Amino acid sequence: MGKIGFHSVRRAQPRLFLSLLTAILAVGCMEPTHEAFREPTGTPMPRITLLTYNTLHGLEPSGMTVRASESQEVRQARLDLQFRQLSLIQPDVMLLQEVNPLPEMAERYIAAMKRSGLDYQSVHQVDACGVRFAPGLAVVPGLNNGLVVLAKAPLRLRKVEGLKLSGGFGRCDDYMGFQTGELRYALIAEVENPNTERKVLTVSLHLHSGFERNAFFIQKIHEAVKAGKARQEDFTEIVAAMEQDQERRLEEIRLLVKEIDTLYAKGPYLGVLVGGDFNFEPDDPEYRELERAGLKDTYAMARPETEIYSLDPQRNIIAGHGTQEVPSTLRAAIRRLPESQQQKILEGYQRGITQARRVDFMFLMRKPSDSATGCFRQELFGESEAVSAAPGSDHYGVLVTYMADASQCG
């Protein structure tokens, strides 16, 4: 077995990663099984690990339906690699996206961890289902994709809700659903430390996709117009389509923040962890919206000196294959332009989306009174093993490790 590659950033952080995590998720010692009842001890463990990971559903659109984008053998090899790598790092909490099909695939993750002697619980929410009438009766049988949260024993896990963020009419659940367009959800779960009986809200989400790198391309268009290299009127439809995608994500974030605030006010929660595939980049309007709401990027909190790119088409061959796709909305927006100009726009789009970027995040909201000392490390998860040319997904996961002893991060 080859070594898992991790690109890491380590930094002492004496103020910021919280008694929230030590008090909530810390559990004294690593016990192999979940105990239903225990006397609270209040004893923290010195190390806590949190993972957000887009696992890749392996599907692609095909007319009015979807089809597998990879062979069964390739998919199984990817999953085996994921299971092997997850069993090595053994995260205390996992926030997963693009898990398909549900609920069966969530059970496969649990079973894979159990084979390594690890006991996990899971909750899930379907966010893409097509039309499903009953168990085993669906217009698109292979589609029941969605979000999962897993917690390692002895942590306790409870689903709070599957919050629909956007998509209008329609809903997806385990065995029944109706979907005519893209639906987006946030899976909100409660994680409890039985040793302290304290709780934290965790959220796994996958925001609207649409155009990739909206803010990046809008800025490039403005620069070209200002420099006299392009006419504003030629890009009106493109900018409008990009801004529409951006606004949809902003509305998804606002709805989520409103719900978090409501739950946070009602429940005995010490904090909130939000992780997932956000489909935006640092300093985009959506990122700033989360910051204004009091959610802090755990990576930025470490004051790193280098970037960690969770979507890197140059290094990740699966992500590289995805850059060949051009959104239908982009083709529609440029259809009235001369063919030569269309070609230049498409070439510019391809150059932009082949660049490495950070679109997967872990955000944290905490009590202002929190004064924990300690440090944390943020790393990529799921890079190719030495014996494998391909990673487990088109995204790398984001692994956050908190250590109560700040000297361990030096």
Please state what every model-predicted region is.
Residues 4-17:
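Bacterial N-terminal signal peptides that target proteins for export
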Residues 17-27:
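Bacterial N-terminal signal peptides
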Residues 28-116, 122-123, 127-135, 139, ...:
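N-terminal, active-site-proximal structural segment of metallo-dependent hydrolase catalytic domains
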Residues 30-40, 258-273, 278-410:
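Metal-dependent phosphoester-hydrolase catalytic domains
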Residues 37-42, 97-215:
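Structured beta-strand-rich core segments of catalytic domains in phosphoester-bond hydrolases
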Residues 52-78, 170-179, 208-248:
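Acidic/histidine-rich helix-loop elements
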Residues 87-91, 110-118, 155, 261-265, ...:
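Sec-exported extracytoplasmic/periplasmic mature domains
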